[in-house]
Amino acid sequence: MTLLTSSLLLFSLLTSRLEAIPVLEKSPAHPAHSAHTAHPAHPSPGVRILRAPESLVAPLGDEVVLECETSLQPERFEWSHRSSRSPGAGFKYLRTGTAKANVSQEAAISRLRVLVRPDTLGEYRCVGWFGPLVVTSTTARLELASTSLVDAQESEAPLQWRVSAGNSVLWSCGQQVQSNPSASWSYFRNGVEIKPEFIGTNGNLFLSNVSSESSGIYSCQATNPASGERIQLPGSMQLQVTPEQRSQSKSPHLLKGQPSSQEITIREGSSLLLQCPGVGSPPPTVVWSSPDVVGAVKNKRSKVFGHALEISNTRVHDAGTYICFQDNGVRPALEHYIKVHVEQPPQIVRPPWADLTNEGDRLKLECEATGVPTPEIYWLLNGHSSVDDTEAELSNNFLILHSVLKRHAGYVQCFARNRLGEHSAGTLLQVNPKQIQEPRESGGTHRPKPNQGSKQKQMYPPTPPNVTRLSDESVMLRWMVPRNGGLPIVIFKVQYRMVGKRKNWQTTNDNIPYGKPKWNSELGKSFTASVTDLKPEHTYRFRILAVYSNNDNKESNTSAKFYLQPGAALDPMPVPELLEIEEYSETAVVLHWSLASDADEHLITGYYAYYRPSSSAGEYFKATIEGAHARSFKIAPLETATMYEFKLQSFSAVSASEFSALKQGRTQRPKTSTTEEPTLQMGDRDTTTPSHNETFNMSPMLTGTIGGGAVLILLLISTCLCVCRRRTSRSRGNNPNKPRMAELRDDFVPLGNCSPTKQRQRTRHIHITLNPLAQQQQQALEEKNDTDQDAPYYQRPSSYDYDPTLRRMSSSSLRRSQRTLERAGGSNGSNNGNNNNLNQSAEAGAVENPGKPGRVLMKRPRLSSRSENLSSGSLNSVGV
């Protein structure tokens, strides 16, 4: 009874259903911050801003157009504005159709037309609504085009410079001009526009290797590229170039009005031109160097043109002090210092990352960015500033939510900004709501059912479903039942309705079983189901109806609005490639896959794995894999030593990719040794479809027990058969009509053939061969007695299994038999009443052949027990 109970318990444990377990890979570190710990792929809503509005500078009264494009068509676009008159105020949504702002939408592109006025200047944002999910663009600035002079003096005297030929001259013409955007410059000599060899920054005119032809009066003009406004600068420069032979030797020096040092600010990626002022006689030679920048001059991006140094594709590490050293052999030499600042637009290198968070928990998000000047970090929660949230706290680069609420669910965005622009990154924040216990009704005549106790279990509903587009007419729903101690759920039903007036809820026909009451993870149990026969270009809502063990039901909260986009209007999702199906165990395999090198993982939320036996043409079983960085996944339980076919597809919040190519793999064959599979992290597994994989697998212990019992039964049957055979042999030996020769053969059947165990020695087959004289006498007797009814005897050759002990025993027995027969022959042929066939044959032979000596054949008495086997080798025919 104890063995039976243990076997049943072991059987129940072995047949328990396993779930699909993901094998997680370590996500690669971000290339820009490999020193930091890398996060997994941050949850993405599947939508993003493809093209944010750009900052513009326009003249007053002009009309500008701001454009915004999203990866998918949203339900609607909105624009927000913050006026430059009140920079401390917040953003306000614009009313469309007004005189100063007009919004139009074409698919996933929105355009805002703005009339440039003092009250329309400021910052603008584009906001895309995807149900309750809000995605906000970076900020675009609208500024007024302007050009003005700073500290202008109308009666400024012109500069008069006298230099020898061969020198290089630098004239700073535009130091008095302030322009937005930066002005373009035109230069004139004696009223005629010239094209300088080098176009400097900030209105600097650089004349290299001047000659007598370079003499004249120089002037400049600034033009605003946005408004076209032109300003003629009042200052001018009169240059006189003398032949080098007539000039006296002078050390390198600066001309009147030339700066003793320079400070230049440039944007990263631009070309930088450094110009060195100073003249001398003879013209000095220039050597460039930098104490701050290693290899500043001797590299592929730098070129030296005498008094000018050009650096292309400027980088942040090019910032520093540059020294222009001039020497013509006349002391002292001249050193000119130029300070270079390289500004860099902001770039987020560590985006925020959030996982499924329980309502009421504390959440800390980090956002790290680079840029020069150091960017400012701010946060938006579904389009709303975190500054206005009472639960939010900003600490350096962190956003801390002291208590996560339902309204925080959605898209959390981090923005980094400086004067060069903005950059943003976001994460999808999912909030697991608290289960609110329904209050009991006070009063009334409600009576509990007989099977209910005083404490009734609550019906905890499932979470709202997440919706993913599968095709133009179908979607995939994913939901979860949080851990709870309420009534068990039996089945689910899916309900959906088209958004609009007088649209009723429709229920699918499929009953989705809950499966075994086992939690997939600490958060609960996950489920998936598909809904078909939908109409593209329509908006739907979905909810899950749970049916409980008390035959009551309760529905989940409604999902967000989902717009079923046609496939032609969607960007294709990256298609995973199945690389290998690893035989993990007898009931599990591990899928390994990869993505193309140019695939955008930010579009991916997870993967769907489909599988079925290769011999089946039925529906596929499904498993959900969360995370874009996953590259392997364990599928279990499966049937032992069975071939399966697998395929994968990636998915996001709004679409799914094409299927990967089918790939086959099998589970391992049963093993004789007992092994235990390692326990891995549980993953999401589709439990909505009844699985044929719920068949049980025998454990090695149970298999050994059953096998041992079968062996014992076989041994018992063999023993019974041997006993019956011996009894049959004995009954045959008692038959008086049986020929004596046949009886003689039966007497020497070895008892070893009936042994039930294998501990005996190999069976020895002993055969009796009559001597030739006896055979002749027997043949003569048979010819004489034609009517004899005895069956003929067919002789078999003797065969021995060599055993020296038996051979010695057989020889001694033969000698004893010979002596006995000799004594019997000497007693006048008396046979002591033993009138058997052997004696009759001998007598017949003696009568027919009187001249031949008589031959007597005798059978010795029957031997009992094992002595019969041991002495049987001596009973060959003996002649006397």
Curated annotation (Swiss-Prot):
Low complexity bias: start-end ranges: 823-837, 864-880
Record has 4Fe-4S as a keyword: no
Positions contributing to heparin binding: 497, 501, 503, 541
Sugar-bearing residue positions: 102, 209, 466, 557, 693
Extracellular side: 21-703
Signal peptide: 1-20
Residues in Fibronectin type-III domain copies: 461-567, 575-670
Domain notes: The first fibronectin type-III domain mediates a specific interaction with Hh protein, in vitro. The second fibronectin type-III domain is additionally required for in vivo signaling activity.
Name of the protein in question: Interference hedgehog
Lineage: Eukaryota, Metazoa, Ecdysozoa, Arthropoda, Hexapoda
